[in-house]
């Protein structure tokens, strides 16, 4: 069975911006491996969940662990995408407005350099940032890009026909 993760895509529709200026909050992984990687390295906050755990509950937990923010409000299902690794990621979107300066990530231990036998404690996430939808497509992992399409389509359907 492929690994499973659940995640949340926080979005906002800032007032005073041109209509259609949807923004999404993405995270950049911490640690030396990711330090010089930017475009194509960002992701939605997500993490693995156990067989007996509800995916949405796991997504909320992972979001808080990786950002320090509390996810609340209506959660819009975005379905699942499969990453290149084979991992299945199930995601929801919610409207929020977290300040990237307030991001606080959990930490984890890695072996660094690889196969060195040395351990290094790193933040799981070293940065969070708001992106316009077009810019997000450049920075987000390509195997999660479909989640942006689904969010845009979901919000378009909810807003009804243009007048």
Question: What kind of region is each of these model predictions?
Answer:
Residues 1-44, 92:
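N-terminal strand-loop-strand
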Residues 14-16, 31-34, 50-51, 85-86, ...:
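Short, charged/polar surface micro-motifs in flexible loops or helix N-caps
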Residues 19-20, 101-107, 140-142:
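Short, charged, solvent-exposed linker or helix-capping segments at domain edges/interfaces
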Residues 44-78, 132:
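The catalytic Nudix box helix
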Residues 80-117, 129, 151, 155:
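Active-site-adjacent beta-strand/loop module that shapes the phosphate/pyrophosphate-binding cleft
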Residues 120-126:
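Non-DNA-binding regulatory cores of transcription-related proteins
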Residues 129, 133-163:
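Charged phosphate-binding loop/patch that engages nucleotide di/tri-phosphates or the phosphate backbone
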């Amino acid at each position: 069975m492929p690994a499973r993760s659940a995640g949340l895509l926080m979005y906002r529709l800032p007032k005073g911006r041109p209509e259609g200026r949807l923004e999404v909050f993405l995270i950049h992984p911490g640690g030396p491996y990711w330090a010089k990687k930017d475009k194509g390295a960002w992701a939605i906050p997500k993490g693995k969940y156990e067989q007996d755990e509800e995916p949405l509950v796991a997504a909320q937990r992972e979001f808080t662990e990786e950002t320090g923010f509390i996810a609340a409000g209506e959660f819009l299902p975005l379905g699942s995408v499969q990453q290149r690794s084979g991992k299945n990621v199930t995601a929801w979107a919610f409207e929020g407005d977290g300040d990237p300066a307030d991001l606080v990530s959990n930490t984890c231990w890695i072996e660094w350099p690889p196969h060195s036998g040395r351990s290094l404690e790193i933040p799981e996430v070293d940065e969070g940032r708001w992106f316009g939808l077009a810019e997000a497509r450049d920075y987000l992992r390509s195997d999660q890009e479909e989640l942006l399409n689904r969010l845009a389509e979901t919000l378009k359907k909810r807003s009804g026909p243009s007048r």
